[in-house]
Structure formats: structure tokens, C-alpha cells
């Protein structure tokens, strides 16, 4: 049975309104006031776009980042890669966004990265860029063909924080997600390194 949705007060921003970000933001917009920002023009069905990262950060208490983390074409999944050297994703876009978000943030802001990164990357390369705001890693387990449905009906929600505690930022995210979910998913909280 679907829950009746109602707009809550927590303002939200989605930075990166591509295939993943737009569909997730449209689901969030059924429950929360939300704005989106993307370098490419978008036309979402139920939320407004802003013209800058600064406007997105100023609007929101929770800022989601859904930026691409491209990988080497040899690792696209078409062929086995066990014989190839290990290669990481390219985090340039995410790093640029975090640096800009940091300029306009303070400790009242929770920045949530949903982009794909390898274990250890958040602590080693990304979180140090965000000195003014709080940070959580929250990768989505979503199939690209059914993003909106998968987002509202997850099997589990994964949240990574500095210490892996289920209090503080993790609790804030759990409370944020509950009114949007059409099911009762399992919430798995760990550190950024897990």
C-alpha cells in the first residue's frame, strides 16, 4: 500500500540532475521542497532548477550530489578485467563540486554523496575537501531503467559516515528517507571505508 505523501519542511538540493539525480529528485519533490542544479539545462516535472551551486546550497539543509564518476572504457563490463591493472574512477567532477559546495556551506548543511566511489576514497580524497559542512556517503542501489521506482522501494539504504554511528547524520538521513519510501527498507550504516 502506498503511503500518502505530504510536503515536509526540510529543504533539499540535488546537484547533478542527470539520469540518476533527476529521477531521485522527482521522488523527493513529492515529500520535500527541492531545487536542482546541473551544468546542462534540464526540465524536471515537479521541482525547480537554480542557476548556480551557490543558490542550491543556500536553499537547502541537505545537499545531494549525483555527479558522474567515469571509468576507463576497458572497465565498462563488456569483458573480464581480472588480467588488467586496478584502476579507480575519475573523481574530478565530484571534487570540483565538493570544493564549490564547501565555499557556500556551514556546519548546518549535510552534504550527501550518492555517486559511485571505491572504498577508502571518501576519507582519503573527498571528505577533506568539505571543511565547512557535514558529510555522508549514501550510494543508491538502483537500476538505470527503473530509477524512480527503485529509489522509492529500496531493499536497503546504505549510509556511510565518519564513525559509522547510527546517530547524528545517519539518523538525519534515515528520518529523511522514511516518509518517501513505499516499503520498509533495511538501513545499513557503516563508515566511509566499508
Enumerate the predicted regions with their spans.
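Nucleotide donor/acceptor-binding cores
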Residues: 9-10, 109, 155
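NAD(P)+-binding Rossmann beta1-loop-alpha1 motif at the extreme N-terminus of oxidoreductases
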Residues: 1-58
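Rossmann-like NAD(P)(H) cofactor-binding subdomain of soluble oxidoreductases
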Residues: 71-147
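N-terminal Rossmann-like NAD(P) cofactor-binding module of classical short-chain dehydrogenase/reductase
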Residues: 63-64
